[in-house]
A protein has these predicted regions:
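Short, structured coil segments at secondary-structure junctions
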Residues: 60-62, 70, 78, 179, ...
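Short active-site oxyanion
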Residues: 39-43, 62-64, 158-159, 218-220, ...
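Active-site phosphate-binding/coordination module
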Residues: 23-130
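Conserved acidic, metal-coordinating active-site core of Asp-based
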Residues: 109-223, 227-232
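Short acidic-hydrophobic, aromatic-tinged amphipathic segments that line or gate anion-handling sites
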Residues: 90-91, 144-148, 256-260
Length: 272
């Protein structure tokens, strides 16, 4: 029995554990290693794929299931095994998602649109529209003709992602409502210029309830900074937000920590 036995810390990555454009600090790494060494459980909850997260979290003692695709996948780090997926396109009997994607391609010529499947990130817009982050990510992606992805029974979509100017995304969301796909999904801003759709009842917080069922009796401490972390923090026993969090997220958090650049996990673990 260690000091932190019976506790799980599950943290968002970008903006919470990782500064924008940065890496996980050595200070945070040492704090996490100490926490796990004293019996604690640690994992991450992110919009990223496991592959994309791996480049950042390599070397961390991830000893609890991780949440990916903003709640559409639960993944066992130690066994490198997908435990659960909740596809966006499940139940879309009228194939509305491919129809919406076609119309979005037509109406938003500056957008970068990405279809996330279990095996790859498919960019369905021209290379000239690519989100500048793509070459620097730790995962494979391919430029794919949308028509190769319209059989969603064969290739289920886990997430549909748009990068564009915020004012364009407001019209994009209105189009989703007009075409009926918004009613099939949970849609949210993950950054000011990023909008994501996952399946209707999917969120980091909903998947955290599955983690809770797998780890009965464990106290869950969740850290997050942006609107896609709202349900995650609400589902935790203790919620934590950095000083750099979105104002609504920081206001809702039980514990209000320092900025992401000031080693949030060090601050948190010192207080447990």
């Amino acid at each position: 029995m260690g000091k932190f036995t019976g506790k799980l810390i599950i943290s968002d990555l970008d903006g919470t554990l990782i500064p924008r454009g940065g890496v996980i600090s050595e200070e945070n790494r040492r704090a996490i290693a100490y926490f796990v060494g004293e019996g604690g459980l640690f994992s991450v909850a992110t919009g990223r794929t496991p592959e994309a997260a791996a480049g950042y979290v390599e070397g961390l003692p991830l000893n609890a299931p991780g949440i990916f695709f903003n709640g559409a996948m639960l993944y066992d780090w130690q066994r490198k095994q997908v435990l659960k997926t909740l596809p966006l396109t499940a139940g879309d009997e009228n194939n509305l998602w491919p129809a919406f994607a076609r119309e979005a391609l037509r109406r938003f010529p500056e957008a970068c649109l990405e279809v996330y499947a279990e095996d790859n990130c498919h960019v369905v817009t021209p290379e000239a529209n690519d989100d500048p982050r793509l070459p620097y990510e730790y995962y494979r992606y391919a430029h794919t003709d949308l028509e190769r992805l319209t059989d969603t029974g064969k290739t289920p979509w886990l997430k549909f992602f748009a990068c564009d100017r915020h004012e364009h995304l407001e019209r994009y969301v209105a189009l989703a409502e007009e075409m009926g796909v918004a009613a099939l999904a949970n849609g949210f801003y993950s950054e000011d210029n990023y909008y994501e759709f996952v399946a209707k009842d999917v969120s980091k917080g909903a998947m955290l309830e599955t983690v809770r069922e797998m780890l009965p009796g464990v106290e869950i401490i969740a850290c997050g900074d942006y609107l896609n972390d709202r349900e995650l923090l609400a589902a935790a026993d203790i919620s934590v937000a950095p000083a750099t969090a979105h104002p609504a997220i920081r206001a809702a958090a039980k514990l209000k920590g320092p900025a992401v650049e000031e080693h949030l996990l060090v601050w948190l673990i010192d207080r447990l």
